[in-house]
């Protein structure tokens, strides 16, 4: 409801960020480190790139072309939107612990793979400045 209430005529994307994160301490630490690294490497002004609560104007989606097909797509998307001049509004969203199961991400091989993918994305977007062509 907060995301919908934040939509205005001058807003291209309403981006959520987690509040009251209901995770174990080690996930909070890893998540915080990840977000600081992402903000530093990609110069992002978004508070939480991986919060999946977002409303995006179709016209903004039509301006960018995303190529990632892994977990770094959220970083590519936010970086591409920011470069396209998108106007962001950020809204806090409640975050709850998983009632069942475990995340597959918080294992060393997955963390390593994500780190490598993040560096590859950094090289493509920040060094080569290759954000891809706009969609036709």
Q: What is each model feature region?
A:
Residues 52, 77-78:
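Short, hydrophobic alpha-helical packing/hinge segments within bilobed ligand-binding/sensory domains
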Residues 44-45, 66-69, 78-96:
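Catalytic donor-sugar/metal-binding loop of nucleotide-sugar-dependent glycosyltransferases
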Residues 54-56, 82, 123, 136:
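A ubiquitous, low-specificity "background" feature that marks scattered single residues
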Residues 117-136:
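C-terminal, non-catalytic tails of nucleotide-sugar-dependent glycosyltransferases
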Residues 57-60, 86-87, 121:
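Secondary-structure boundary/capping motif
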Residues 1-71, 98-115, 132-134:
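Acceptor/aglycone-binding surface of glycosyltransferases and processive sugar-polymer synthases
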């Amino acid at each position: 409801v907060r995301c919908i209430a934040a939509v205005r005529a001058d807003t291209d994307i309403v981006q959520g960020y987690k509040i009251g994160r209901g995770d174990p301490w080690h996930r909070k630490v890893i998540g915080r480190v990840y977000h600081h690294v992402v903000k530093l490497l990609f110069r992002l002004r978004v508070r939480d790139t991986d919060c999946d609560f977002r409303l995006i104007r179709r016209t903004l989606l039509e301006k960018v072309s995303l190529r990632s097909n892994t977990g770094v797509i959220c970083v590519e998307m936010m970086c591409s939107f920011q470069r396209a001049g998108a106007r962001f509004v950020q809204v806090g969203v409640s975050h709850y612990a998983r009632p069942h199961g475990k995340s597959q991400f918080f294992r060393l091989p997955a963390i390593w793979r994500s780190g490598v993918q993040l560096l590859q994305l950094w090289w493509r977007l920040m060094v080569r400045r290759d954000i891809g062509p706009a969609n036709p």
